[in-house]
């Protein structure tokens, strides 16, 4: 792996071109993971608390899993841990998740069919560095963070990151191995390559 990230101007240019080509060709869907849980809207805040406690032993990421809310099989919103902080414990059994949910549209999202370069830009604009991935019908299918994007790019380069390094990247919410993906996309934008790519995708 270290050999791929060599030194020298020609080596650096070829690496950048390889990254750019992958960011254009790879799509969000296959790169996504599923960093969200699901609760029904009529479940109590106690259920949310218990869910967090059960996951405390293995959730070591900088950003905990999102909690999406359903009603009768329909996605209707999401809920944060803020109600657990704002309300006394005795109210957790009286109030439901649905009473404190927020619109699903508030979460930054991207379609499965979008190219990865769009994900790189969207992640920079998102508050927490995570995106909700949606299918053609606009329904949630997964999530995407920087480590997901980085892992997909490394696979495209036929490089496999050791699990401990990938987990460390996920905990920090950054690109594994310091992949300069934002710089690659910025260069593509400056050269006008993204305009040409967008036109070819819509034609």
Would you name each region that the model predicts?
Residues 1-42, 157-187, 192:
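Membrane-interfacial segments at transmembrane helix termini in multi-pass membrane proteins
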Residues 73-79, 94-97:
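Helical hairpin unit composed of two closely spaced alpha helices linked by a short loop
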């Amino acid at each position: 792996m270290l050999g791929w990230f060599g030194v020298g101007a020609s080596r650096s240019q070829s690496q950048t071109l390889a990254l750019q080509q992958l960011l254009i060709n790879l799509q969000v869907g296959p790169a996504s993971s599923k960093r969200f849980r699901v609760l029904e809207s009529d479940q109590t805040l106690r259920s949310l608390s218990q869910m967090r406690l059960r996951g405390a032993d293995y959730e070591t990421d900088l950003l905990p899993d999102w909690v999406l809310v359903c009603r009768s099989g329909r996605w209707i919103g999401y809920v944060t841990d803020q109600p657990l902080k704002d309300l006394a414990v005795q109210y957790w059994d009286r109030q439901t998740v649905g009473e404190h949910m927020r619109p699903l549209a508030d979460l930054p999202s991207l379609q499965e069919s979008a190219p990865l370069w769009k994900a790189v830009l969207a992640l920079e604009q998102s508050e927490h560095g995570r995106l909700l991935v949606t299918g053609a019908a606009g329904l949630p299918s997964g999530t995407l963070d920087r480590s997901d994007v980085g892992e997909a790019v490394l696979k495209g380069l036929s490089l496999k990151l050791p699990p401990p390094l990938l987990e460390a990247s996920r905990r920090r919410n950054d690109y594994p191995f310091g992949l300069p993906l934002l710089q690659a996309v910025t260069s593509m934008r400056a050269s006008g390559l993204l305009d040409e790519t967008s036109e070819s995708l819509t034609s």
